């Protein structure tokens, strides 16, 4: 866990719309804090785990090198051509997205080539088998080891917008669905349109969705837990005018602003996270660092950021309901 630096803090205190939600949340706690019965401050900004560095998320793949004589004997089929593409100057520095497409091409070329030399045929057959086993890792490298993933998972872009809705993520959903189809058919060596594949990675990058969601639910959790802990100590002595004030603040800040925003975030995440988690699974085995990072998005793991956010939301609702019930007051908006 890392305390967020000066850039984010400056954004929160300024007019940066990426942190508009922070103002809404701090107004909620500030409103409660004006009562003499509680002291609740905005929680410190503490970051969730960030995307691991490239060397901690890239999986090593088997290199395929052929000698000159073998290369000449393979010119009768596509193996020599495809292998030559990888061994070129540009091929040696190809990005992971292109390396994934190359892996598909070289396996397809080897398995379709009629090789006269039994020794060479056995060698290439072994290489193709090994590369088939590594395809999920090549796929994961393409998804999670480029500049696109760094933007997609970046925590420096703030919250999902206050007015965010599922209507704004259709392009992202389409891209994720296409990527899942590819990952789910690796054993069949899918024919992948390079321009569409690269375009889908660009869509992920431009959306900045995963990092924004992770930052959003982390801050929501912090605020909800802070409020829940504060009102947990209140008893019937605050019933009457003080409780009337709390009800007013709760309804004007939480029911009218925070809760609807959380509802939009939940609907959005329940569309995206199943696909994102599927992509993590289709890219297995991930590095230890990537497994730890990806676990934050799990819909089911008890220690995920998502589950902690859900528990914070439920406890917040339960605590307010208990307090209103204690003072025989009814209130709208809880679910």
Language-model segments: residues:
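Bacterial N-terminal signal peptides that target proteins for export
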Residues: 1-2
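C-terminal motif of bacterial Sec signal peptides marking the signal peptidase cleavage site
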Residues: 11-14
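Acidic-enriched, low-complexity/disordered segments with a strong bias for Aspartate over Glutamate
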Residues: 16, 23, 65, 70, ...
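N-terminal Sec/ER secretory leader and immediately downstream segment
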Residues: 18-167
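A cross-kingdom marker for long, charged
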Residues: 18-41, 203-335
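Generic structural signal of hydrophobic/aromatic residues within well-ordered alpha-helices
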Residues: 28, 68, 86, 106, ...
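Extended, low-hydrophobicity segments enriched in charged/polar residues
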Residues: 123-228, 232
